[in-house]
A protein has these predicted regions:
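Enriched for short, Lys/Arg-rich terminal
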Residues: 2-5, 9, 13-24, 38, ...
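A short, surface-exposed loop/turn module that caps and links secondary-structure elements
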Residues: 29-53
């Protein structure tokens, strides 16, 4: 199944604050996420529609909308992800 990946303004700002090699790695993973949801993806327990994707020390927090669209809300270091 193909997905459209949209980044919220806060997620774009988060990516801009990362080092280039980390941002590039996350961008590659988001590109692969368009075609399949494999990888370390888990549904967050206390949130109904939100998921997290683990990319090394970083977490990509996103929501799946209408089974065709992925909305990325945040890209944060793991120590800040669940606050």
């Amino acid at each position: 199944m193909n997905y459209t990946v949209d980044l919220k303004p806060r997620a774009i700002k988060d990516l801009k604050h990362l080092q280039k090699h980390d941002a590039s790695r996350i961008a590659d993973v988001l590109e692969r996420l368009q075609t399949d949801l494999t990888g370390d993806v888990k549904k967050l327990t206390n949130f109904t529609l939100e998921y997290r994707l683990r990319v090394g020390q970083f977490r990509v927090l996103f929501e799946i909308e209408n089974e065709t669209r992925i909305i990325v809300y945040r890209v944060v270091h793991r120590r800040e992800a669940y606050r």
